[in-house]
Amino acid sequence: MSNIIKQLEQEQLKQNIPSFRPGDTLEVKVWVVEGAKKRLQAFEGVVIAIRNRGLHSAFTLRKVSNGTGVERVFQTHSPAIDSISVKRKGAVRKAKLYYLRERSGKSARIKERLGA
C-alpha cells in the first residue's frame, strides 16, 4: 500500500522547479479563476520560509504592498502554479526569516548573494 502512494506522489511532483533558498526573491505566476475567466497573476516577494515534505512541500513569500506586508504560502507542486523564477539571490544566515515581519524600510533589506 505504501509503495502505491509513494509512486502516485512521485508522478505528481513537478520537475521544472528552480532551486531557491530563504532570502531569495521569487516571481511566482499563479492561475487565478474569476468567474468564467482564467488568468495568470504574478506575485513577487522574498522567501521567508520553506517546508520540504515531498509532494506537500510549500514556501512562503513576503512583499510589502502600499506599506502593508503581504505574505502568501504556495504549495510547491500545485497545478495552479504556472512558473517560478528567481529574480535575486539573497544572503541570509537563518532558515526562517520571520523577523522580517517586525522590520520595515532599510532594516528589512537583504544583502545579495554573490558568486553562487
Swiss-Prot record:
Keyword Ribonucleoprotein belongs to the record? yes
Entry superkingdom: Bacteria
Any one Gene Ontology molecular-function term assigned to this protein's record = structural constituent of ribosome
GO terms under cellular component: cytosolic large ribosomal subunit
Q: List the disulfide bonds.
A: none
InterPro entries noted in UniProt: Ribosomal_bL19, Ribosomal_bL19_CS, Ribosomal_bL19_sf, Translation_prot_SH3-like_sf
Extract one GO BP annotation from the record.
translation
What are the entry keywords? Ribonucleoprotein, Ribosomal protein
> Keyword Ribosomal protein on this protein?
yes
Q: Which family does it belong to?
A: Belongs to the bacterial ribosomal protein bL19 family.
Q: What does this protein do?
A: This protein is located at the 30S-50S ribosomal subunit interface and may play a role in the structure and function of the aminoacyl-tRNA binding site.
According to UniProt, the name of this protein is Large ribosomal subunit protein bL19
Q: What organism does the UniProt record list as the source?
A: Mannheimia succiniciproducens (strain KCTC 0769BP / MBEL55E)
